[in-house]
Amino acid sequence: MTLISVILSFIVIMGFAITTHIMFKQKKLSRIKNDFVNNMTHELKTPISTISLATQMLKDHSIPESSKNLSNISRIIDDETTRLRLQVEKVLKTAVFNSGKMKIKFKTLDLHQIIDHVVKSFYIQVENQNGKIEKEMKAENAVAKVDEVHFTNLMFNLLDNAVKYSNGKPEIKVETRNFNHGILIAVEDQGIGIKKKDQKKIFDQFYRVHTGNVHNVKGFGLGLNYVKKMVEEHNGSIKLISEYKKGSRFEIIIPQQ
């Protein structure tokens, strides 16, 4: 009888432990989902509001045509429309990737050319924040088989991340070198860094480093998750080296064989 009681007690305790674990997991997933929805709402609302204000200015008959600065207004609408499109595409690409329907088209390309193109697209943004981007292209052989679109996107995400977490004026370094029959590409910043407890989760889908304000740093928490998946699709690897309040360095290795 005692043995049966012990077994029953053990079953009850295990059942309680499993139920509690499931409840905590569901609560965590619910919190992540709510954070994602809040961030997505904020990210989509901002460009929509800006476009709305710009169009109201165009329709406002009380403002003289000469004072409206039409070229500036049209540029704002164009920029915000592009921003809105990129945000929507980012969510859709993640959904397609998770469904397993995304196709990778490998081509032999010079990665230095792609990296240079992406870096140039950030020059104005970084200069407007009184920052700088340095390039150290040390790889003697920068040719590898990659998907041009996705490799461009993953580089864009890494640089975008470096700018977002710059904590003031961005100081970013992009470097390449040949390493173990591959090309090592590093994006390094002098930003806020990442705490040890967050580093293991940094590549999780929807995960965003807490900065005290949920809207302090824009984004859905999809960027680094996408980067990791795409590096793995290229049979490569990614590593994070970070020190809190001192900056982060992301290193990816793309094989060349």
Language-model segment annotations:
Residues 79-84:
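Short alpha-helical segment of the dimerization/phosphotransfer core of two-component systems
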Residues 99-104, 143-146:
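Conserved micro-motifs of the catalytic ATP-binding
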Residues 235-237:
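Conserved glycine-rich
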Residues 231-232:
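Detector for a conserved hydrophobic position within an alpha-helical segment of the HATPase_c
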Residues 105-110, 127, 132-142:
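Conserved catalytic submotifs in the C-terminal HATPase_c
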Residues 162-163:
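Short helix-loop "hinge" at the ATP-lid/N-box region of the Bergerat-fold HATPase_c
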Residues 194-208:
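Short conserved segment of the HATPase_c
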Residues 169-181:
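Short beta-strand/loop element within the Bergerat-fold HATPase_c
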